[in-house]
Amino acid sequence: MAGGAFELFAPQELGTEAYKYLFILENEKSNPASINKTGNKEYIFTRRHDPVINSIGFNITQGRLGNALYVTRKMANMYLQSNGLPINPQTWNYTKVDDEYKNRDNRMNNQLMVPGQTYWGTNGGRIDWSGNAAEIANASHRNFMPQTGMGYFPHKWCSERDGVPTGMEAYDFPIIRYAEVLLNYAEAVFERDGQISDEDLAISLNLTRKRINSEMPDLTNDFVTANNLDMRTEIRRERTIEFFDENFRIDDLKRWKTAEDEMPMNLTGVKWKGTDFENRWPDASFKEKDGEGCIIHEKGRNWHEKHYLLPLPTDQLKPVSYTHLTLPT
């Protein structure tokens, strides 16, 4: 952290969308600031891709953007308000389909598709980044309106570069990036000491928190105390938000020994009852709803202690008898 070789990707020209473009950075045509991969000092170790010699080989954008990949209400509720405080789902305004995206951590809009917005993909990409009528006409999703699944859809990893053939996206995949170093540090200090100083928060967690949220208050000990928050919860929240859709979540839940509480929860979606979704998504009327009027996508889930363990390969169990062992059930 003190070496200075790496830094968070936050070009001023990309403003509050810098986080989004980090994950789809290819050549100068992949973002409105004409930045290429040499401008990314955040990735430490990556799986490199190139459109000519080593493309990704799978059309991630087309398979994800507005498609059958769903996000839960649990995740949507974790994004902070722009004032740095958690939302209260019982009192938050959900009347219009885009209300819950307003005045939130900007990463929510960088990661999730907002109803009513326009999105570009490989089958309808950006032309000149002007947002003019011609570019909007070329968009793959105009006036996006969720009408399947749980109603939340991601657009992280979805390229906006025009004319990308199927499977030819070529942005790099981060195996470890500087943001992970920062948040590992914050969590490790807190877990070691049972507390963390404002100085340590300033050089770690608050850098990711404020990358595209310059007006959001810092997370400090006074802020936690004044707002009756829990520091461990906020550190874990920041990690969950920052690493959304990067395959960290299940390992984190196991590491924190909270999977037994989190995994059995119902998978719920948008609040449908009593909102404009009733008019905009009438086909969801048959879907089961919970007490808040939210779509229930899946229930009756369970978690057993054995799920904390990695499976034992059956071919490694054959040579020796393990009948004397008692495995968790």
Task: State where each predicted segment sits.
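Acidic/polar-rich alpha-helix caps and helix-coil junctions
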Residues: M1-Q62, N83-L325
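C-terminal/domain-terminus segments
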Residues: N59-A76
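Signature of lipid phosphatidyltransferase scaffolds
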Residues: M75-G84
